[in-house]
């Protein structure tokens, strides 16, 4: 971040309130729009800014992820998402997000070995699972168990020590697939499957999800490749609701396990992490291709309350760069599994075709997003809808941890404290109960 310059001069923005003016510096990032630094605004003019939901506010500096929603660009540490998804392993992306650069061979081998050594859970956590009902939602189990990890691994709770931060980061990223898979097994009444040192991150998750004690399990390479892609595509997405929650909690100095649990809780909200499940429900409700025109008409009717799920994005005003990769992956998975003429996929393709050619959606820039196809892929792989958001959390933990570390290590980091515009009652005097 640096001060913006125009014709050799530092750029400023003049803000006037009630006849008084103040010059606010304009800051430039590596990419993206400039921002106005308004930190001195209250002192100079006695006012705050009002931006509900922080939609137009940069709350932090970050070197991790860049999004250009107008152009459909997503970069991790400068690398386009399509290049990473096509060429990298998820472990490489973990290293990249945490450390800023892709690893060389020696670094990669050391890193993956360390990651593998942290996949096991404390044996007492098996007993912790028994406290949940068998019909508990897997996200409830995931959130509760991750939040409890600080009780099982208290040795790294002092985050002022860099080595502790690194240890906590590795533990969280390595253990969350195990917790997630065990949450699924617990709800199914099946025996827990332990992680294997001979499998990579994506393969291990599939093994712990679908292997059984009674027979050997061989990971399908096509499904492993698809899982690797899904993990990479969901690894980080800048300052979204759950990431901002992690940063807000982390700014208090809370232990990293509690911070990630807070992020999981935020992700659980249907407006954030449940979009791919909503797509499946929408397609099931449509039923068949012949019903699409009537459904589209309902979507256009503001009074119907019907929404087109899987299209449009809070940030992307162009095609979601992750959606094209998901579309390709969807076809690969269905072909590998021998699923032909899948009714949901046929519906999805036809719905996409109609929506992309309809002026109503084109003018509003409602393009398919990553959730449009991911739900179909996960369903085909045998992952139940109750686990969709859990898988999202597994992938996003890398981003959360990276963002948390970046925030903690930022010079001058302090507790986050948003302001408000108070619209309640003015000051008034207490009236005794008998006189009310």
Curated annotation (Swiss-Prot):
Protein name: Citrate synthase
Transferase recorded as keyword: yes
EC number of this enzyme: 2.3.3.16
Pfam families attached to this UniProt entry: Citrate_synt
Additional notes on this entry: Citrate synthase is found in nearly all cells capable of oxidative metabolism.
Oligomeric and partner information: Homohexamer.
Active site: 313, 371
GO molecular function per UniProt: citrate (Si)-synthase activity
